[in-house]
C-alpha cells in the first residue's frame, strides 16, 4: 500500500462533480509499478441492498495477479475489506486464489501464480 488518505476540497469536488464530497482513497502498488486504486465515498454512502451473486449477468468481478497473496490478504483485511474465504491453492497447484469485495461490494479476484 502506498497511499491511504481522506481526500476532500475543491479539487475532489470538481473531479467528481459532487460538492462537499469526502473520499477515502487507497492505492496499492506492485513491484513492477502496476497500481490499483480503491475509493470509498464516505460523505455519500449508498446502502448495499443485496450483494450481486457471482453468477449474475454483466460484469460480476475483475481479477488481478499479485506477487504475494498472503501478504495482500493481510493488508486488505487491515483495510477492512471483506473476503469470501481465506486464500486457497487451486486443485492443479498452479495458483493461490481468493475473492474479496471492495468498499462498494464489487468482487475482486486475487491470484498468485505459483508455477
Regions found by a protein language model. Give the residues of each.
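Short, structured secondary-structure boundary patches
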Residues: 18-24, 102-109
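Short beta->alpha transition motifs characteristic of CBS
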Residues: 110-115
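Vicinal oxygen chelate
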Residues: 30-34, 40-107
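Core segments of cupin and vicinal oxygen chelate
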Residues: 1-33, 78, 91
